[in-house]
């Protein structure tokens, strides 16, 4: 009799454990370094009894682990996406609290946003402004060489060079339509 017959929980755990371990080895060096930094900072915040920093770092680690379980890539671009989302949420919450005259809560959210921003800046990923500048230069170059190009083709061309820009296609994709309209005008192709 197999040890998994009596407990479906054990079976699920045993089956998924090797996949999780394999995925863990596929993470990038920047991903691992950031995770180690977060764990070290959590320990420091706990020893120094910094409640806001401790809670923020715990929530960041939980979000990263949640993304790992969901099967997302384990690289600096996935971290950037997760941290950007968390930062945006904190900034929005702070402005909502401030508009409702809850300055105490707004200050906590702003402090959390600052902590998350510190980790965002430590990642070796190009900022949105840098990516937009590179995209604008790239589209201008394509326009001068090839003239009118459909947006679909621009997406394909950008996909080939996106790795050189130190970003991911996921981060570039929403910027392409705006830059396309700047360079080629408001033509839909």
UniProtKB/Swiss-Prot annotation:
Subcellular localization(s) per the UniProt record: Mitochondrion
UniProt keyword annotations, A-Z: Mitochondrion, Transit peptide
Keyword set includes Mitochondrion: yes
InterPro entries, A to Z: Asn/Gln_tRNA_amidoTrase-B-like (IPR003789), YqeY/Aim41 (IPR019004), YqeY/Aim41_N (IPR042184)
Annotated organelle transit peptide span: 1-32
Span of the signal peptide: none
GO cellular component, one term: mitochondrion
UniProt-recorded Gene Ontology molecular function terms: carbon-nitrogen ligase activity, with glutamine as amido-N-donor
Keyword Coiled coil found: no
Chief localisation class: mitochondrion
Family to which the UniProt record says this protein belongs: Belongs to the AIM41 family.
Name listed for the protein in its UniProt record: Altered inheritance of mitochondria protein 41, mitochondrial
Source organism (scientific name): Meyerozyma guilliermondii (strain ATCC 6260 / CBS 566 / DSM 6381 / JCM 1539 / NBRC 10279 / NRRL Y-324)
Organismal lineage: Eukaryota, Fungi, Dikarya, Ascomycota, Saccharomycotina
Gene name tied to this protein: AIM41
